[in-house]
């Protein structure tokens, strides 16, 4: 049956350059169509695509950035506003990591005036700690705003549900769609879409010349990454995907990080690219060269994994020529990397491919812990037992208690304690609870984020 008689609902994605419009377009389309880049203004034409949102066919428009000083800005702006006028719903995307400018607000109001059927989508809110940044956009006065992170796939399902509701598509049952539409959607869907979110993203980090590229080659059994005795032969992150059983793992070999100090030119570019690669990673393989003693820079680099809340595995490379006995190295490791005490340790010689299969299987094990969700009843049972065993210290003589606990996110696991006096939760008691949860539920190689909230804050979130 021909479907041309059906009028599709149209969604336009608008906003300034480099806020993540094309990335959101690709995420909703579940296919890499628009070119995404770190450079502002990459999309200059309107990309149009028929997509399926939870089985409902809609038309999605990705437009060029609307910055005042962008190339062909007048033409692009006119085209954007025309797309806004013709659309059933606008997703106006802003960068949650930036402070909104007067230009942001001016452009948004112009779009809203053209078509008030508009959602404010605050992108790059990568974790719960960054929600506070979204409050800066309250001046936009939008009751319908959504905190998302396209790169971390956070908040996307909530946004899709709201889109379907706004377009009155929630009540349409699948049987009402023409059979040929369903067949078309099924046939045109990229074959790897179903498992797209199951690809484990692994960043390989470490100092220059510790063996990161050799490790990548050993893991993938390819000479994809240039290996040389010359320090710093990898500049751009190099990625390679392998399959272990049914599980896809994408490795990114990042540029080696040199000594501290002023970094200019291509090294600055390499460091920025490394940071970008880690933003998209689930797990970091921290490669340490044990042919010589650890240095301060090793600790600095390890903090990158902590900064991005990644799962982590410590890879002790060049073990066959280690500088000291096993006991001495492990004692030094425990002392210098105390904050990574939950990370598994694997010794290897990448050039000789020792223990490479162990690394692969450990990645899957850590990712399972990284993605773990604890049933609420079980979580509260453990928290209750812990607080009974060691009661919470009082706050100036006033009782401090936990009403309940809830896990609100995974990758990494994030848990909220709903309390009567959240500010009274001392860091040492928080550490006690985290250690208790680790012992009970096995969060191998995984950061565990625990925060305290009062009932009012919990209800608002």
Curated annotation (Swiss-Prot):
PROSITE patterns: G_ENGA (PS51712). GTP 1 binds at residues 15-22, 62-66, 123-126. Keywords: GTP-binding, Nucleotide-binding, Repeat, Ribosome biogenesis. GO terms for molecular function: GTP binding; ribosome binding. SUPFAM superfamilies: P-loop containing nucleoside triphosphate hydrolases. Residues 9-171, 200-371 form the EngA-type G domain. One of its GO terms (biological process) is ribosome biogenesis. GTP 2 binds at residues 206-213, 253-257, 317-320. It comes from the Bacteria. Residues 372-456 form the KH-like domain. Associates with the 50S ribosomal subunit. Belongs to the TRAFAC class TrmE-Era-EngA-EngB-Septin-like GTPase superfamily. EngA (Der) GTPase family. GTPase that plays an essential role in the late steps of ribosome biogenesis. This is GTPase Der. It comes from Helicobacter pylori (strain Shi470). The lineage of its organism: Bacteria, Pseudomonadati, Campylobacterota, Epsilonproteobacteria, Campylobacterales.
